[in-house]
Each structure stands twice: as C-alpha cells, then as structure tokens.
Amino acid sequence: MPRYSITTFGCQMNVHDSERMHDVLRCAGYTEAGSADEADVLVLNTCSVREKAEQKLRSEVGRLARWKRERADRVLVVAGCVAQQEGERLLKQMRAIDVVVGPDNIPELPGLLGDLAIGGLPIARTVFDLDAPRFLVASPPSPSSSSSPRAAPTAFVTVMKGCDERCSFCIVPHTRGPERYRPSDEIVAEIAALVAAGTREVTLLGQTVNSYRDPLGALPRAPGASADDPDESEFAALLRRVAADVPGLARLRYTSPHPRHLTPSLVLAHAELPVLPRHVHMPVQSGSDRVLRRMIRRYTRAEYVARTRALVEAVPGLTLSTDIIVGFPGETEDDFAATLSLVREVGFKGLFGFKYSRRPHTPALKLPDDVPEGVKGERLARLFEESEALLAAHLSALVGTTQEVLVEGRDKERGHGGAGGALWSGRTGRHEIAHIDGAGELDLLGEVVEVSIARANKHSLQAELTEAARAAARPRQRGGLEPRPARRSLPVVAAEGG
C-alpha cells in the first residue's frame, strides 16, 4: 500500500481540507505514514494569505529535495491556496513538484496520483467547481461498531466556500473563488452523522460564514421577510435548523463571520439557542474609519461597535475575539491609536494580530506599502500588550467560579498534571482553554463537565472537577478505544479571516 503524509499551513479551512485529503486518499487505498520520511507521497497544503508564501514554499521544497532523491518513485504534491494562486508556474519553477492541486480539486487527487504512477507527466489541476460545487464530508466511525475508534469530540463542517467581500488586502477571492453554498439538508445530515458517532461540538466553516444562503431555498424565513431583508439571515435560520434537528449536539460554533452580516436575526438566534456558546470571533481588522474605507470593509467603527454591543447585550457574559491588521498602507499613528481604543472599548478577550503584507491579485497592491517594517512590528507588539492585559484580567476574574468545560483530550505535554496523572484539557463555552488537574484516572473525553477554576495561567485556566462532576464521571478503562484525531496536522501559521 502506498503511504502518504500531509503537512498543513494556514487557517482552519486548510486544516479541514487536509482532513478531507486524508479521507479521499484512505478511500483510494493509501495508508498514512508515521512520518514524512516514511511516506511515498508527501502533500504540502499551503496558505497564501501571509507575506512571501511562495518563497516559503520554495524553501520547503528545497528542503525536501533530498527526500525526493532518496527514491525515484516518491511524489511531492502542493495543494492549497499557493497551488491555486500559482498553478502550472510551480511545476516550471520547482521541478521537484509532481502534482499541483487546488482546494476545489481535492477529490481528483487519487486519480492524478494514479496517472503519475503509470508514467504520466507532472500536472496542475486548479479549476473552481463553479457549476457544481463539491463539498467533501467527514467520515465518522460507525456508531454501531465496537471496534471503531471513538469520534473526536470536536469536528468541522463546511457550509460554504469562496468569498464575495473583496476586501482590498485579501487574496482569498482569488484563491478560493466566489461564494458557493451547500444545501442545508446536506449540512444537517453530516452534523447528525458526526453526533451519532460521538462528536459533541461542531464548528461551521466558511470564508464569510454568516453570509450563507441555502442554494435550494429550503430554509424558512420569518413571516413577511423577503430574501433581501437586511435584518434577516439565512445563516441564523441554518443555526436554528441544526439546533432543532440535531438535539444531541452540545455546542455549535462558526468561523469566520463578517460584521456586515451580523444581523438582528442572527443576534436573536444567539439569545434563544442554548447550543450556541457564549463566544463569537468577529474580525474587525482596524479601529480607524479611514483605514476601514481603504480596506473596503464596508462598515464603520460605530457600526461594528453597535452590532457587537447588541450581541453582548442579548447574551449576557458573551465574549468577543477578533482579527486586526497593523501597518496597512497609509495607517498613521492616530489610526493605530483608534485601533487600540477600539480594543479597549469592545474589550476583546483574544485577538489574532498581523503585520500587513502585500499580496498579489489584491486591490491594495496598488497602494504604497509606506509603513516601515519596524513601525509595523512596534505597533503589533503594542497591540499584543493591550490584548494580553485584557485577557489576564478576564482570566483572573474567573478564578473561584464554576464553569462547564467540553473535554477535548488528554494534555500530556504541558507537564503540570495533578495527582491523578495526565491532564485533561478542553474549552469552556466562552472558548477559554481549561486544564483539569487530578482526573487522570477518569474517562472524561467528550464530556461536558463542571469544574472549579483554581487559578489563571497566561493564556488558560487551571481547573479541578467539582465533587458532583467527579461522582458522575466514568473510570478510565485500560485498553479502551482511543478517539480518532480531530486534526491530523497542525496549522503552523494563523491567517486572518472575515
């Protein structure tokens, strides 16, 4: 059996794409190698959002040249957004690459590898599936099979792909294409299958996930509402349908939304659906109206504040996190000060910060990149300092409280397990990471457990099971089934969304 290995760079969508590549390769008879050195086929699933993505790929391919030379039959595949962006140019520029495959062409990967194995030439396949969008689904273990691995507690489900927003800094519309939506019936069916296999939390994925529309018109609208009613949201209707049709689901998250589509009906869904956790990641990118206009974000600072405030008021205790770019062309010190003041005003409990980098095929490429790199770095450091202070105060305030944590797995590498041995780790409903001490002898995987917060770490919480949770927990069985991993490869660079 040919063996494969996948290395993933970039955003959560890329992680999900890699999981689907695992599925299509396994179904075609490939087996996963223990490491890249043992692989016959090595896939690099690339990200092009950040600066110098092509140079980073060239460096990685150069590093793998010896791996290729060791055996003539080894195959190097480049997938993801750099593959979509560069296409056949990659084959001409880097002769070590055998196959280039775009995100929409993942189902064709086994066939491309098969053609190559019988003497075919290196090939690039980067065609958007505009007429008949294909959405690869997860393949959970059968709930009826006692020998099947347990499903991971968390899973990702794609509801749409592509983006129509066309923010001036973003290459995603070029690498992922226009928005295409998946029928809600298919989405609900996939989530139901995951939950039946043991998954407790599902995250809905889309480049601008809350702009979702059912292509078959199967979701109900509010009485009297029209399709173009700005207060309505088919995405909110999708959330309601999942909540109603999959009652065993513990938590339903989504990423990445766009502030323009944070409608009153979506706010109301958050207020009324217990399955939606009290945390939303809502990218803002800048706190300056002048910069937001140059970014073509199509909202003002005041509109962002008003919409997120409505959400927080509707769901007491809800926390927000965000994405911010510093050093966008023309950003002044006053513009950056406006961003810092927005961070304080909204009170973000987490953020992903990035230095602006010029990307091909983006409108901002025409603007002078006039903020010096040193200034960008200094502003990013100040942004993180502000964010760290807000997070520290938030985590400290939780000490002594009781929280519900969805246990996602064992945390053996952190080295601060309690008396019960290895540590369990999970997230609260507000997305705080919690490490549970002194419960190594219990089987908590996939359970929503009540914990008492003992102390705050820099980016997480240290917790202990309450007496009631400990009494209700199952003892850990030696030799029991291990969960199937939720993520088989780790993203090495976070990418801004929304």
From Swiss-Prot:
InterPro entries: Elp3/MiaA/NifB-like_rSAM (IPR006638), Methylthiotransferase (IPR005839), Methylthiotransferase_CS (IPR020612), Methylthiotransferase_N (IPR013848), Methylthiotransferase_N_sf (IPR038135), MiaB_methiolase (IPR006463), rSAM (IPR007197), rSAM_horseshoe (IPR023404). Residues 2-118 form the MTTase N-terminal domain. Keywords: 4Fe-4S, Cytoplasm, Iron, Iron-sulfur, Metal-binding, S-adenosyl-L-methionine, Transferase, tRNA processing. Residues 469-498 are annotated as: Disordered. It comes from the Bacteria. Residues 149-393 form the Radical SAM core domain. Its EC number is 2.8.4.3. One of its GO terms (molecular function) is metal ion binding. Catalyzes the methylthiolation of N6-(dimethylallyl)adenosine (i(6)A), leading to the formation of 2-methylthio-N6-(dimethylallyl)adenosine (ms(2)i(6)A) at position 37 in tRNAs that read codons beginning with uridine. This is tRNA-2-methylthio-N(6)-dimethylallyladenosine synthase. It comes from Sorangium cellulosum (strain So ce56). The lineage of its organism: Bacteria, Pseudomonadati, Myxococcota, Polyangia, Polyangiales.
